[in-house]
Structure formats: structure tokens, C-alpha cells
């Protein structure tokens, strides 16, 4: 009798197949590591794909310098424990201009420090394929993106000029200067991610678990007071509104642009139970998603992941 795979094992097998395909097809792949839960799952799958050997490609963090401090500590610990070949890139032009999310706004900050920073790094190291942890259930522009997402020589995405993907057959042919973004987790849901993290014992950033944290409510979003830099951009009236609440994060990005959610979920089973009952998007707290109508698709057209 043929054993039947659970849906998580089917997703795992599909993702491992995609990762191995890219490693075999492309000359210089890289795995982007944003330190979040999806990156944690993708990295775990990649290590499984090539176990007991080491990853045949580096991992890269495009650093905006505005991530949560706990994210940086977690990244450094994972690199040391797993022996990862980590590349960290910060856009030097953005640093020279003093780009930050407070003075320049979320759209400018994201474009310079994330999109342009990513394009710089891909060009600098000549990567022809880059793994990312995006999923189709996250956001509508990602829902129509292929597993192999083709980009032109300027790293731009044209949703009308993508190749068909039949079953598990992927066309990796690219011209000189072109590249692909690869999404092994395309068919996973947020609930799948949490269930897999629980079953596999994958370490994640503690910010995903509820705890008492200092936050301020700005435009309906709970922003965590992560370091002293945010205080420089708050008025005395705003500082007086800082309070401690029991919160956690469903998604992690630059801390001034990422909202927390009120929650009492302090364990993985409690988070999974919360996911079964929630009726809101995990990206509701991402300020960059609300810059304008269709902003995520426009960012992706310009080279954003």
C-alpha cells in the first residue's frame, strides 16, 4: 500500500524539489534571508535538501539598518550555529543620504534601502537566481506571480511576460543579464508555515510570541519602541502616549513600518489556534503596503522582491 503524504509533507517535497532544481540549473544562486518566519522555513528546507552537505549557495541579508534589534541578534546566532555563508549588503548611497523611514517616508525608504539595495547586491555578486520566502496567500500581486519569476536586466518584473508552469516543470532559461526570483513557498499558507515550524521545531525570532512591549499607536498601527532613534521623531505628546501592551508580530520588517497586534499567544500551539480564528491579513501591519493603491505590484515592477 502506498503511503499517503500529509499536505505539509507534500508542500515540503515540492519546495525541496524547487530548491534542488535551481541549484542544478543556475550558475550563481543566492538565498535571501530576511530573518522572518518564512525565511526560517525556507532555510530549513534548503538545509534538508542538501543534508548532510552544506548549502551550495550563500544566504544574503539586504539590511536597511532599521530592523528590530532582536532580529539582528537572532540572525547572528543562526549564522554561527548553522555555519552559514552570510552576505550582508547595505545601500551605501542611502546611508550617505541619511535615508530613514521618519524623515523620508515609507515609500522612499523602501525604494532606496530595500529595492535599490537588493538590485545593487544582485549586480555586485552576479547572482542569476535569488530565492525568496514570499507566498501567494500574502498579497494579491504575489498571488499571480510564478514560482520562477523572471526579471529583465534591470531586475524589473513584467506580470504579462511570464512563462507557463505546468505541473512541476520549470523553464529556467535566461539571457545574459536576466535573472529569476524563485519562490519555493508559493503554495504555502500562513497557517501551513506555523504548523510546519511547530512540527519541525524551527527556531524563530521571539517577536512572534506575545509579550509585554512598549508601543505607541500611530494612525491605527501599534509601533514598538525598539530603540532610542524613534524617540527623536516623536513629539512630547506622542511620548506621553507610549504604553505597555501584550502584543506580538505576525510579520517582521523595518520596525517603524511594522505594526504589532494585540495577542496573548505565547506558544506555537496558541499562535496556530489564533491563526485558525483570525479574519485579517498578516500584512495588515505593514505600512509600506498602504502607500498607494496597488503599491506592492508597483514596487515589484521596479525590482522589489
Curated annotation (Swiss-Prot):
Gene Ontology terms: biological process: hydrogen sulfide biosynthetic process; sulfate assimilation
Pfam family, one: PAPS_reduct
MF-aspect GO terms: ATP binding; sulfate adenylyltransferase (ATP) activity
InterPro entries (UniProt xref): PAPS_reduct_dom, Rossmann-like_a/b/a_fold, SO4_adenylTrfase_ssu, Sulfate_adenylyltrnsfr_sub2
Keyword terms of this UniProt record: ATP-binding, Nucleotide-binding, Nucleotidyltransferase, Transferase
CDD domains hit by this protein: Sulfate_adenylyltransferase_2
Quaternary assembly: Heterodimer composed of CysD, the smaller subunit, and CysNC.
UniProt family annotation: Belongs to the PAPS reductase family. CysD subfamily.
HAMAP family the UniProt entry points to: Sulf_adenylyltr_sub2
Protein name in UniProt: Sulfate adenylyltransferase subunit 2
The organism of origin for this protein: Pseudomonas aeruginosa (strain ATCC 15692 / DSM 22644 / CIP 104116 / JCM 14847 / LMG 12228 / 1C / PRS 101 / PAO1)
Upper lineage: Bacteria, Pseudomonadati, Pseudomonadota, Gammaproteobacteria, Pseudomonadales
Amino acid at each position: 500500500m502506498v503511503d499517503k503524504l500529509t499536505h505539509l509533507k507534500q508542500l515540503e517535497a515540492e519546495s525541496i524539489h524547487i530548491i534542488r532544481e535551481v541549484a542544478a540549473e543556475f550558475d550563481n544562486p543566492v538565498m535571501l534571508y530576511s530573518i522572518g518566519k518564512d525565511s526560517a522555513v525556507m532555510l530549513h528546507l534548503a538545509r534538508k535538501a542538501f543534508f548532510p552537505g552544506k548549502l551550495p549557495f550563500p544566504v544574503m541579508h539586504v539590511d536597511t539598518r532599521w530592523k528590530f534589534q532582536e532580529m539582528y541578534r537572532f540572525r547572528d546566532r543562526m549564522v554561527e550555529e548553522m555555519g552559514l555563508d552570510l552576505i550582508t549588503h547595505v545601500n551605501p548611497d542611502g546611508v550617505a543620504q541619511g535615508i530613514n523611514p521618519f524623515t523620508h517616508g515609507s515609500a522612499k525608504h523602501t525604494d532606496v534601502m530595500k529595492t535599490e539595495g537588493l538590485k545593487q547586491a544582485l549586480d555586485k555578486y552576479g547572482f542569476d537566481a535569488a530565492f525568496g520566502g514570499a507566498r501567494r496567500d500574502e498579497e494579491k500581486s504575489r498571488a499571480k506571480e510564478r514560482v520562477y519569476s523572471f526579471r529583465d536586466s534591470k531586475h524589473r518584473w513584467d506580470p504579462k511576460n511570464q512563462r507557463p508552469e505546468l505541473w512541476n516543470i520549470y523553464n529556467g532559461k535566461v539571457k545574459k543579464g536576466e535573472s529569476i526570483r524563485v519562490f519555493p513557498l508559493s503554495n504555502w499558507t500562513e497557517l501551513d508555515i506555523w504548523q510546519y515550524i511547530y512540527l519541525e521545531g524551527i527556531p524563530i525570532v521571539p517577536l512572534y510570541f506575545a509579550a509585554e512591549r512598549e508601543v505607541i499607536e500611530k494612525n491605527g498601527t501599534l509601533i514598538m519602541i525598539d530603540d532610542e532613534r524613534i524617540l527623536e521623531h516623536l513629539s512630547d505628546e506622542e511620548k506621553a502616549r507610549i504604553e505597555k501592551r501584550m502584543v506580538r508580530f505576525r510579520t517582521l520588517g523595518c520596525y517603524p513600518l511594522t505594526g504589532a497586534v494585540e495577542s496573548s499567544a505565547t506558544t506555537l500551539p496558541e499562535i496556530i489556534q489564533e491563526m485558525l480564528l483570525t479574519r485579517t491579513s498578516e500584512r495588515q501591519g505593514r505600512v509600506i503596503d498602504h502607500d498607494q493603491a496597488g503599491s506592492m505590484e508597483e514596487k515589484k515592477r521596479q525590482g522589489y522582491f
